Amino acid sequence: MSTKNKKAAGGNGGAPKQTRQQSHDSQDYSSFKTVLFYCMLIVFLPVLTFFVLKGFVLDQFLNISEVKVNIASAVGAVVALHIALGLYIYRAYFGAPGSKGSKTD
């Protein structure tokens, strides 16, 4: 059998290559899910924090002017944004357990 026929027949070298590709695909998908989660957290957490603080917490329970309510809600949103960014940076710097990549040639 010629070399050309062995490759077409799916010789023994195809299985490790396929599992390696699946491993890379699963790592890429896991990375994508992580980045997507943190992007959504960074975008939506401050907005949600602003409106929750403004609409439910500060307006309902505290008797302060609307300008002060807006300022306090904005400060809360900025704090929430910094927390989300800090979580992302912590995860990016220290990584998830078992995420150490190994070099393969």
UniProtKB/Swiss-Prot annotation:
Q: Does the keyword ATP-binding apply?
A: no
Spans within the Cytoplasmic topological domain: 1-36, 90-105
One Pfam family of this chain:
VMA21
Its cellular-component GO annotations read:
endoplasmic reticulum membrane; endoplasmic reticulum-Golgi intermediate compartment membrane; ER to Golgi transport vesicle membrane
Q: What membrane topology was assigned to this protein in its record? A: Multi-pass membrane protein
Q: Where in the cell is it found?
A: Endoplasmic reticulum membrane; Endoplasmic reticulum-Golgi intermediate compartment membrane; Cytoplasmic vesicle, COPII-coated vesicle membrane
One GO biological-process annotation of the entry reads: vacuolar proton-transporting V-type ATPase complex assembly
Ranges in the topological domain labelled Lumenal: 58-68
Provide the protein name. Answer: Vacuolar ATPase assembly integral membrane protein VMA21 homolog
Q: What is the protein's known function?
A: Required for the assembly of the V0 complex of the vacuolar ATPase (V-ATPase) in the endoplasmic reticulum.
| Family statement drawn from the similarity comment of this UniProt entry | Belongs to the VMA21 family.
